[in-house]
From Swiss-Prot:
Subunit and interaction comment: Component of the RNA degradosome, which is a multiprotein complex involved in RNA processing and mRNA degradation.
Region (Disordered): 394-437
Organism ancestry: Bacteria, Pseudomonadati, Pseudomonadota, Gammaproteobacteria, Alteromonadales
Protein's name in the database: ATP-dependent RNA helicase RhlB
Gene of this entry: rhlB
Role according to the record: DEAD-box RNA helicase involved in RNA degradation. Has RNA-dependent ATPase activity and unwinds double-stranded RNA.
InterPro entries: DEAD/DEAH_box_helicase_dom, DEAD_box_RNA_helicase, Helicase_ATP-bd, Helicase_C-like, P-loop_NTPase, RNA-helicase_DEAD-box_CS, RNA_helicase_ATP-dep_RhlB, RNA_helicase_DEAD_Q_motif
Length: 437
């Protein structure tokens, strides 16, 4: 975590339970991020908050520290049953729930509190067996939580702490009825510690907060900056014919450590994947059609570095929290302005630098004015030399509806990246620059 992303406030400055502080010390967290420094004094005073913060600001640790501290300093309800968790953390996607659970388990090490995670798509019986043993903190997606509530596997009537993460995405994905269903089955808002976090505190999000929370205090981090200053943005105006050669050429020139390429449709993503795979890149594909087990495997490979480039639609990428993404490429400009912010927010996180490259082609260039109006600044335009684009691009690989998770056809060339790189051991083809300032 970069020091430019941290405040001068230390976790040790707060009256945290000794086991929470011990866990923080062991994982190396000493200084708070701004959202942690602002929210923890409120939460430790047992007051509710509605926090506005982008992903990568440290909000997850803020609400986890508050949740663990609350459960360790408050007595459990008398006659609490084994199927009654004490805290519930709701997330819009499986991937976000999984990441929250990983972070929660780091804090749970010395506390004796049990963490359980539930999400749709797989593992129904396995997840149920964990719940049957009893848990203190339930983390999951609303649909699967409701399934277990309706079956009596989970009873939320003893909840002492509630977290709603990425509330704006909950609205986008149509989960608000599910959330209200769960809130109505919990104890009164005044008897719980309630936390809501959202990238934007729109009127609908604030209405949800005031309906189901106890006079929450609003906490905002850089509300006027929709895009991070740590992200270098640029935009190209390629023709439809030069769009793919430009992408492949920029990947060759930028040689990003970890990149995500966004496209607007499943078909377009498959096309991009085919060209990158044919060119020998170690590339994964995430669309709504990818089965959950394969999706998790691809994400694990991307996180571990076995895949360098991930091609994804907006829906498939929602909730992704992957560290160290150096570049984001908008192969298509999104139709939704907020999607642009969410896309490029995958890079430049936790104080790191990132690069966002967008293509304004003939089909999607009309989306640009609305995007620039929404982010309140113009995206710098970069020109390129058509003659410098790669001209030895292999044919795309046929997808056969079962794309491999990474390249298996890397060409045998000695390379500048030992044990991998975008084309296995393949080096860059040449050092010609394609950008013109």
């Amino acid at each position: 975590m970069s020091e430019t992303h941290l405040s001068t406030k230390k976790f040790a400055d707060f009256p945290l339970h000794k086991e929470v502080q011990q866990a923080l010390n062991e994982v190396g967290f000493e200084f708070c991020t701004p959202i942690q420094a602002l929210s923890l004094p409120i939460l430790l005073a047992k007051k509710d908050i509605a926090g506005q913060a982008q992903t990568g600001t440290g909000k997850t640790l803020a609400f986890l520290v508050a949740t663990f501290n609350h459960l360790l300093t408050e007595a459990a309800p008398t006659e609490r049953k084994i199927n009654q968790p004490r805290a519930i953390i709701m997330a819009p996607t499986r991937e976000l729930a999984i990441q929250i659970a990983k972070d929660a388990n780091l804090l749970a090490k010395h506390t004796g509190l049990k963490v359980g995670i539930v999400y749709g798509g797989e593992g129904y019986e396995a997840q149920r067996k964990v719940l049957d043993k009893g848990i203190d903190i339930l983390i999951g997606t609303t649909g699967r939580i409701i399934d277990y509530v309706r079956q009596g596997v989970i009873d939320v009537s003893a909840i002492q702490a509630v977290v709603l993460d990425e509330a704006d995405r909950m609205f986008d994905l149509g989960f608000i009825k599910d959330i209200r269903f769960l809130f109505r089955r919990m104890p009164d808002a005044k008897s719980r510690l309630n936390m809501l976090f959202s990238a934007t505190l729109s009127m609908k999000v604030q209405e949800l907060a005031y309906d189901h929370m106890n006079e929450p205090e609003k906490v905002e981090i850089a509300p006027n900056e929709k895009t991070s200053k740590n992200i270098k943005e640029e935009i190209f105006y390629p023709s439809m014919e030069e769009k793919m050669p430009l992408l492949l050429s920029l990947l060759e020139e930028d040689w990003p450590e970890k990149a995500i390429v966004f496209s607007n449709t499943k078909h377009s993503c498959e096309k991009v994947w085919s060209w990158l795979e044919g060119d020998g890149h170690r590339v994964g594909l995430l669309t709504g059609d990818v089965p959950q087990k394969k999706r998790l495997r691809i994400l694990e490979q991307f996180t571990s570095g076995d895949i360098d480039v991930l091609v994804a639609t907006d829906v498939a990428a929602r909730g992704l929290h992957i560290a160290d993404v150096s570049h984001v490429y908008n192969y298509d400009l999104p139709d939704d302005c907020e999607d642009y912010v969410h896309r490029i927010g995958r890079t430049g996180r936790a104080g790191q630098k990132g690069v966002s490259v967008s293509f304004a082609c003939e089909e999607y260039a009309l989306n640009l004015p609305a995007i620039e109006s929404y982010i309140q600044h113009s995206i710098p335009v970069t020109s390129y030399d058509s003659e410098a684009l790669l001209d030895d691009i292999p044919a795309p690989k046929r997808i056969h509806r079962k794309p491999s998770s990474h390249s298996r056809n890397s060409r045998d060339r000695s390379g500048s990246r030992p044990q991998g790189g975008h084309r296995g051991n393949a080096p860059r083809r040449h050092d010609k620059t394609r950008r013109h300032s």
